[in-house]
UniProtKB/Swiss-Prot annotation:
Topological domain ranges for the Extracellular compartment: 35-48, 105-143, 193-295, 396-416
Protein name as annotated: Putative gustatory receptor 57a
Keyword presence, Lyase: no
GO terms of biological process kind: chemosensory behavior; male courtship behavior; monoatomic ion transmembrane transport; sensory perception of taste; signal transduction
Amino acid sequence: MAVLYFFREPETVFDCAAFICILQFLMGCNGFGIRRSTFRISWASRIYSMSVAIAAFCCLFGSLSVLLAEEDIRERLAKADNLVLSISALELLMSTLVFGVTVISLQVFARRHLGIYQRLAALDARLMSDFGANLNYRKMLRKNIAVLGIVTTIYLMAINSAAVQVASGHRALFLLFALCYTIVTGGPHFTGYVHMTLAEMLGIRFRLLQQLLQPEFLNWRFPQLHVQELRIRQVVSMIQELHYLIQEINRVYALSLWAAMAHDLAMSTSELYILFGQSVGIGQQNEEENGSCYRMLGYLALVMIPPLYKLLIAPFYCDRTIYEARRCLRLVEKLDDWFPQKSSLRPLVESLMSWRIQAKIQFTSGLDVVLSRKVIGLFTSILVNYLLILIQFAMTQKMGEQIEQQKIALQEWIGF
């Protein structure tokens, strides 16, 4: 409960999602702000989002160009591993590209994005007024604050600590670069968490609608036959509305989510190479250099936590929500058996089942990649296989360097 000490008691879905959407807005990755416990689109919010993106790009590459102009920085880069430098350059390029895609796509779909929350709020109002449902916004808000607070703290500490360690006389520039890098990479990360939270919200409502469809509850709560039939129709319409919301989420997040997932998958494999491949060479330097290498690898491991968590956990939430949606539809199929005296329900059930066959609704990202547990298995196998290949490559590279050193030593010994 201490987590919610500084936050007002959530009463609507806007209050529940406010914390995570504020973070997304501060990163410039949505086009609506928060005013009086609701979300609104204005020219000010649009201008702010674009200004944050432009400022982050300018400061990021401006500070980088100034740093690269320093002689000592160029000397340190000349001594660095070429593959690590290539990976770092690729990470910077992909991160800025993904951030730009995320900002532009969510600006374009800002009204549809806002419409998802408005439709969800309207559905919640019907659940509370007609069925007396308790949606437990407090629990959801507490979870968002705890998870994102921990992940954000770890991410900021890792990036800024690494910047301070490598600063060596250019601390202000490195910290500015680290701040801009945090915004550029954090925006897509928070967007992924928002998508994950929306999927979880829909799953909670699907489970609630399953309880409302139980004949025991309907007979106890609505004994009048005409009221009971009205409530059944309302529940069925809300189930269909939640399915439409899944389709709307897919449209809004298609491009930004696909770009972020491609970036996370590509960079996770590369960062794993740096972690495990470079650790092979630790121990061959002096004690001070070894300590510095271990600290940098530790910072890198912490930076990997947010993208890996999002990459592997988000499909699980999506898959579970689809599972709950299918359970709702199976309960709707049984309405004919539970209420045989209500012949007017038969056309409703038949139309919904026909719509279900045609729709085949799933959570997807761009290129129609279905977000499910199969995707988690695919991502995990890719990461493991790449890890093994990269470790083998790193060990081969180190072995080649050792052979070259032995060759040079032998040539010096025989006098060549």
